[in-house]
Amino acid sequence: RQSKVSEVLSEGNKIRNDCDYYFGSAFYYEKELYWGVDRLNYLEDRLTELGAKKSPSNESLAPLSIKAPEILDSDKLINLTYYPSLNSPYTFISAKRIKQLEKDYPINLITRPVLPMLMRMMAIPTFKAKYIISDAAREGRKYDYEMKEIFSPIGKPARKAYSCLLYTSPSPRDSTL
């Protein structure tokens, strides 16, 4: 029994590695990775576009149902802490949406920039970097923030940009986006 479990795990790990992926709970279809259950809607959309949906219903089986309340009335500001990295494609696709949230809701935006992973000496395998870029691009297309060119401000450019925060922030701990 134990050897069968080990065999199944080894086979799954091999398939995952062959797909150039780095952790479990992902879905893979036709050379496209989906990074967990919050990406199932993309897979369903793709299968529907291909005409593979068996049900005549137009209802989604895996809808992404994240909805903000129509009215959020509060005398108190809600703290939202945002951790952007200058090298992250997720920062590119989220920054404008974060600012819109701040505009539309009683939010006290606290921006806490983080150094890019590469500047923190983190090893990033090529397949992980490729996945992050492709996932962020897919997410960006969904929200009309198409990624065209990629700029990677590692090292001195990042340090200079982050140093400006000392002059633009109301306090050393908080910063504006």
Positions of predicted regions on the chain:
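A short acidic, helix-capping loop that chelates divalent metal ions and anchors anionic groups
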Residues: L118-A123
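Non-catalytic, surface beta->alpha helical segment in thiol-disulfide oxidoreductase systems
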Residues: L33-G51
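Short, structured active-site "lid" loops
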Residues: K128-D144
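Conserved small/polar residues in nucleotide/adenosyl-binding loops
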Residues: Y167-D174
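A short, hydrophobic beta-strand/beta-hairpin element that forms part of a small beta-sheet core
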Residues: S25-K31
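Local sequence-structure signature of Cys/Sec-based thiol-disulfide redox active-site neighborhoods
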Residues: K76-I93
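Conserved helix-turn-beta segment immediately C-terminal to the redox Cys motif
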Residues: K99-I110
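Thioredoxin-like thiol-disulfide oxidoreductase module
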Residues: Q2-Y21
